[in-house]
A protein has these predicted regions:
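Acidic carboxylate-rich catalytic motifs and surrounding loops in phosphoryl-/glycosyl-chemistry enzymes
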Residues: 14-20, 201-209
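Short, conserved clusters of charged catalytic residues that mark active-site
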Residues: 46, 151, 186
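Structural beta-sheet core signal
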Residues: 63, 167-168
Length: 209
């Protein structure tokens, strides 16, 4: 929808989205074209020297980041809590099927939990994560994400002073969790304000208020 509004098509676009990339990783990539070391949480390490030249030559650059700073640590925490029985739960989160707050969404989450066949201690660990652990994850992620978003915007603007920069709202995959809703609401508010400061365009998307 964003591309259609701007009159763009995929034939003239390069998708530089990389799976598992967290905001600190993107800071390195836009500055040097590579990550200095593996991200131990996501397991990714990218060496992509072309990215800097692509950014220098682009007419329009869209940036969407911040979601993985909360999402990746949460997936790892769920894995640790369930002794890595959590593939079904991770899959349903990744699918986006938990983006609604309706009863069907809650039922899907509960059904996914049942499939895990967790022990009592594992179940307790998961619910502790949901009720308090995720709040810490999101609280820790916010200052990191905001600092890195600012750094990426500044770096991209320095590389290409003339490009139109679109700062795309971060999407919340699980809005039924209060800690996540708070994180993404704050993150997108920050991005809107940042866009005004740097005279770039903020683009809201569904589940990115």
């Amino acid at each position: 929808q964003v591309a259609q509004t701007l009159g763009l098509d995929r034939d003239h676009a390069i998708n530089l989205g990389l799976p598992g990339l967290m905001s600190a990783d993107l800071v390195e990539l836009v500055k040097t074209g590579k990550m200095s070391e593996m991200n131990t949480l996501s397991g990714c390490q990218y060496d992509y020297p072309e990215i800097v030249e692509y950014l220098k030559e682009a007419d329009i650059i869209s940036i969407q980041m911040g979601s993985n700073d909360a999402f990746v640590p949460t997936v790892v925490a769920i894995g640790n809590a369930t002794n890595w029985k959590s593939e079904d739960l991770a899959s349903i989160v990744l699918s986006g099927n938990l983006r609604s707050k309706d009863p069907e969404t809650r039922a899907a989450f509960q059904a996914s939990m049942k499939k895990l066949k967790l022990t009592k201690s594992e179940t307790d660990a998961v619910w502790n994560l949901v009720t308090s652990g995720m709040n810490k994850i999101c609280t820790d992620a916010y200052p990191v994400s905001t600092a890195n978003i600012r750094s990426v915007v500044e770096t991209v603007r320095a590389l290409n002073p003339d490009a139109q920069i679109l700062l795309i709202g971060a999407t919340n995959p699980v809005p039924l969790l209060p800690s996540w809703s708070n994180y993404f609401n704050k993150l997108n508010k920050f991005q809107k304000q940042l866009a005004e400061v740097y005279d770039i365009d903020y683009v809201a998307v569904p589940y990115a208020q």
